[in-house]
């Protein structure tokens, strides 16, 4: 929402809005309220909002308690008016992954099948054929102070959001090869019983429209710059920069 920032003495960093006065006529609606006493996940962060099929579509990271702490997952919800929202559903679940290929710091702190931490600054992409894709990245946090977006995570995953807001199966859209992970070394597991989770590369599916949408996304270099942090050692595809936001001006130039 819009915040008036003129002649303000101090900002209260303990408040989400800085304690600044809101503009008249602005309303704020809460999508989710969590209560730790009920066992609910209270770390809810990184909202990604788009419009699709006449509804608002929102995804965000939801974790048990802390940033970069497991278990966490990406969930999503929809709304017709931005006021009333559906109960959140899992988009990208909490998983484990094989750490043999991990080449980052503090490897000795990781078990063979380590808890994955989701991290992403870009989720939704609607391709020219109308397909709506959702993505996130799965990384590792060997300890609480080691972020999963340090370039040594495993892979970015993708799935399609259908017109009825159900989801396709999960696929890999990009392995973090610069960080040590390839198709042959990237293996996911269920946390409840350590059983394998089959997540193929996106081009192995028979759905040509989905494959085309994923390939189109991978061809959009400017959009892929939003993936930089998680794959920062892939110098072939990325320039140095963090959390890129951009828009197209009236003259066609890109402002970032």
Regions found by a protein language model. Give the residues of each.
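Beta-rich carbohydrate-recognition and catalytic domains
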Residues: 1-42, 51-117, 126-256
